[in-house]
Design a protein with these regions (language model features):
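Acidic, small/polar-enriched beta strand-loop surface segments
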Residues: 65-69, 276-315
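Short helix/loop capping segments that flank catalytic or ligand/cofactor-binding pockets
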Residues: 83, 254, 263, 271-272, ...
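Surface-exposed fibrous attachment elements
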Residues: 13-17, 268, 295
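Residues in well-ordered beta-strands of folded domains
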Residues: 74, 153, 263, 302-304
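Solvent-exposed coil/turn segments that connect beta secondary-structure elements
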Residues: 78, 265-267, 306
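Polar, S/T/G-rich
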Residues: 2-247, 256, 309
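Beta-sheet entry/capping signal
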Residues: 72, 250-254, 259-261, 300
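Short, charged/polar, Gly/Pro-enriched secondary-structure boundary elements
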Residues: 267-277
């Protein structure tokens, strides 16, 4: 394997962290969302209005790209608005929402523009960014602690190219998600699918097919062999991001014969059978990665679990 390929094979440096906090900072790295997740965002607009400043308007950017859907909205982990935008429980009549998926030609939040025309104009379009606008109306029972932590269910990036269908759309296929990231010239490495010095299309198709293989479940039914669901923070180096995405499908990425070749982890039929006739006189010497005394006999892992309120959970 080439030096570039070897560089993409170490243990990923990324840490397992929940993304369920909404922040207010002047400068933050952008987020990419692949697959399904629940996450916070960045408050880019905050303004109070009304005779007693009882209304609080917030605009929260969730992702740096177009997404498939923005679902239910949570205040401090409780459903405040369902996927249709209907306020629930004690928040009924106290909160409303507008959603923008981040399409290229999206317009400004119409409700916010109507409510605060001198603060939010038709030029505030947030094109290319998925975002929500919330209006909170003060109520002691609804907001006893002030502004709640706000999180949102998302189905992420939905312009991922699939060479098998020659079309773009939403995908949880990790090989396709990795190729989408690597192909981006702004935050990836500009390795476009099927182009010189880009991603080899045949190897990508093979990897994508492996990821989509149906694996039977002990309780019945099946699930894809590998899926990709999570958030990428673009403050990380491309090498670190690629390593982390490769780990989601036991993958390897090699630069060979002028192209990047993506391989998914799966059993493959051997090309050749080695026998004693292939061994040089003197035998073999096996050098393991770790000594026998420091070897392991068990593995524990973590993943961000939807069943555990999108917090890290053990396998």
């Amino acid at each position: 394997l080439s030096t570039a390929a070897q560089a993409l094979m170490p243990k990923p440096q990324t840490t397992m962290q929940p993304q369920t906090v909404t922040i207010r900072e002047p400068v933050v790295p952008r987020d990419l969302v692949y697959g399904r997740t629940r996450k916070g965002g960045v408050i880019v607009f905050l303004h109070s209005s009304g005779p007693s400043n009882e209304h609080l308007d917030l605009v929260i950017v969730l992702a740096t790209h177009r997404v498939k859907s923005i679902g239910a909205i949570y205040f401090e982990g409780e459903v405040a608005l369902d996927a249709d935008g209907t306020a629930q429980g004690r928040w009924a009549g106290k909160v409303l929402v507008e959603k923008k998926l981040g399409i290229a030609n999206q317009t400004a939040f119409a409700g916010l523009q109507a409510d605060l025309p001198d603060k939010w104009t038709e030029d505030h379009q947030l094109r290319g960014c998925a975002a929500i606008r919330l209006r909170l109306t003060y109520d002691q029972d609804a907001f006893p602690g002030g502004i709640p932590n706000i999180t949102v269910d998302l189905e992420g990036k939905d312009d991922i190219w699939d060479p098998r269908t020659q079309s773009a759309g939403y995908s949880e296929n990790p090989a396709l998600c990795l190729a989408d990231y690597m192909a981006n010239p702004t935050w990836g490495i500009g390795a476009r699918i099927g182009e010189p010095d880009g991603i080899d299309e045949m190897s990508l198709v093979e990897a994508a097919n492996i990821c989509d293989e149906a694996v039977p479940l002990t309780g019945g039914g099946s699930e894809p062999r590998y899926t990709c669901n999570g958030v990428i923070t673009l403050s990380e180096a491309p090498k670190t991001i690629i390593e982390g995405m490769l780990s989601s499908f036991a993958g390897r990425c090699a630069f060979s014969a002028g192209s990047w070749r993506i391989h998914a982890g799966a059993w493959r039929a051997p090309d050749v059978a080695l026998t004693s006739d292939h061994v040089r006189e003197g035998g073999l010497t096996l050098a393991t990665r770790v000594t026998m005394s420091s070897n392991f006999n068990g593995v524990r892992g973590q993943f961000v679990s939807p069943e555990n309120d999108w917090q890290p959970d053990d396998f």
